[in-house]
Amino acid sequence: MTTTKSLVRLAHSSDEAEVLAHIRIMHAESGWRELDIDRCRIFLARAFDRKGGILGVIGAPGHIRAMIYVLITNAWYTSDHHLEELFCWVHPDHRNSDYSKLLIEFAKDCSDRISVEMGSKCPLIMGILTGKRMAAKVRLYRRFFGIPVGAYFAHNVCWPQAEPSEEDFWRLPSMAKWLRRHSTGNERKMAS
């Protein structure tokens, strides 16, 4: 059996051109501000130089199929670190794969490893900021993380290829059943 660790590798500076090509595709699908390639290069360098960025990719050099970027950062009110996902993306030709699941597992593994190294928990914060296929993405993240801990709302944003969603993400029947089976009374109160 192939493991997550063997499929997801850390990107290297030699992957930059290919990663940038994928970023252009990703931005065309879901970017909501103008793409600044020089700014992208700054964040890629943080990952390539191991200075607070982690860029995991699936695929050999020249054949990258999926990628995830997590940033070691902190909230404005603390010096305690956490991992923040900047993107988790699978090339359109490979969307019927399990790559998104493998990337999420990779990010969780990074959080676990950094927690051990730091001697305290390094939380992983992942979310969905998109106008396309939101319902499916929310369901995927719920399977890995459980109950959401927040939500984003936007004003004056034009999403490319936006798809309306009528689904109420907070009241999914399957999640209600899961909650009844697996959560404590306090967790159920917080979710309602």
Role assignments for model-derived ranges:
Residues 86-98:
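A short, internal acetyl-CoA/4′-phosphopantetheine-binding micro-motif in the GNAT/acyltransferase core
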Residues 102-122:
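Conserved acyl-CoA
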Residues 1-14, 159-192:
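Conserved N-terminal entry element of GNAT/NAT acetyltransferase domains
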Residues 45-56:
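A short helix-loop-beta-strand connector motif used in the catalytic cores of GNAT acetyltransferases and
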